[in-house]
């Protein structure tokens, strides 16, 4: 009725349930526990620029102070990996800002999402506190961080991915030198 223990060198039975490596037997929760253990030990890196280093990119600082929805839209598109466009995110930010004045609550979730994606530390205080107290500085810091990670913020997610794909295709593979005399 029950299968015998797997012999040494024999293939395990295909059950559709991932094995966790415990001698060929499925251990309940083993795969999930391992996945969560890896996530919990993610390295925490410092931000590449400080919160108050807005003048490192004067153009972005001016744009953000005059119309923060533009900077938010650009960063949100990259953080969402292209699932929402810059225009959509920026318009939603502007709508929340005009209707409620609580755009900081909306934007702090994107800061938290960005920190999770790139393993950034909570600094100098919680995401919501940073966005509620220093909205423009927080948006500028997120923009600079993505820019320093190689994103061209003016072209969006899909164009950045296309550009990275072309750059990878243009680099020839490394060839090991052959036999020499």
UniProtKB/Swiss-Prot annotation:
Major subcellular location class: membrane
Source organism, top-level taxon: Eukaryota
Keyword Transmembrane helix: yes
Tissues where this protein is expressed: Expressed in leaves, stalks and tassel spikelets. Detected in roots, apical meristems and immature ears, but not in pollen. In leaves, not detected in the cell division zone, expressed at low levels in the cell expansion and transition zones and at high levels in the mature or fully grown tissue.
Membrane topology field: Single-pass membrane protein
InterPro entries, sorted: PLAC_motif_containing
Keyword Phosphoprotein: no
TM helices/strands, residue ranges: 88-110
UniProt-annotated location(s): Membrane
Keywords of the record: Membrane, Transmembrane, Transmembrane helix
A biological process term (GO) from this entry: negative regulation of cell population proliferation
Gene Ontology, cellular component aspect: membrane
The protein's role, per its UniProt record: May act as a negative regulator of cell number.
Family to which the UniProt record says this protein belongs: Belongs to the cornifelin family.
Protein name per the record: Cell number regulator 2
Species in which this protein is naturally found: Zea mays (Maize)
Originating gene: CNR2
